[in-house]
Amino acid sequence: RHGKEMRTVLDLYNEKKQNLKLKDMTMVGYQGVICVEAGGPTPGLGCAGRGIIMALEKLKETGAYETYKPDIVLYDVLGDVVCGGFSMPMRKGYADKVLIITSGENMAIHAGANIAMAVQNFRNRGYAALGGIILNRRNVKREEEKVQELAEDFETKVIGKLTHSDLVTDAEEQGKTLME
């Protein structure tokens, strides 16, 4: 998105209702990556999970997948899948695999476990499978051990390890990718 702010699909929908077009919802980012920001309700009001589904439905209705023909689609959702709405991308057939990216911080491990439990709960229904865990290092004590234990608890593997770098935080502050 080249450091530009993105309007969320929910905000655009609330303004335009039926006149929402694909070009309104998408932004071409670095090296042709197509970006979409679903958005959410005012904190304390509404259902964020329902907002995610509405955004996914609008992308489908406007032919996003046929227009852009993406090689891969990534959904970056919160780890708080206690609300069933956050598991909707996998339950509605929008995801084949779930990859959990977590650090060894206790709350991150807890969120990762919640995601893994949600995937397990739907395992017999033919929804998305757990594809593994990626360690996003924060350099906390016993980090690798804790993430490995999480993987073992859910019969999966640690499939990648990201090194902690302040460059990631700097890029995020600028609204850019690390590669930019």
Each model region followed by its residue ranges:
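Short gly/ser/thr-rich secondary-structure transition/capping motifs
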Residues: K16-L20, L56-E57, D80-V81
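Beta-strand->loop->alpha-helix junctions that form or flank phosphate-binding loops
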Residues: L10-Y13, K157-H164
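N-terminal phosphate/diphosphate-binding loop that engages ATP/GTP or pyrophosphate donors
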Residues: R1-A38
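Conserved catalytic-core segment of NTP-binding enzymes
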Residues: M54, E61-I72, V77-K161, D170
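Flexible beta-alpha connector loops of hexameric P-loop NTPases
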Residues: G39-R50, N106
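C-terminal boundary of histidine-terminating zinc-finger modules
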Residues: E172-E180
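Membrane-embedded hairpin module used as a gating/binding unit in multi-pass transport
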Residues: I34, G51-K58
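A short acidic, often aromatic-flanked loop/helix-cap motif at beta-alpha or helix-coil junctions
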Residues: P43, H164-D170
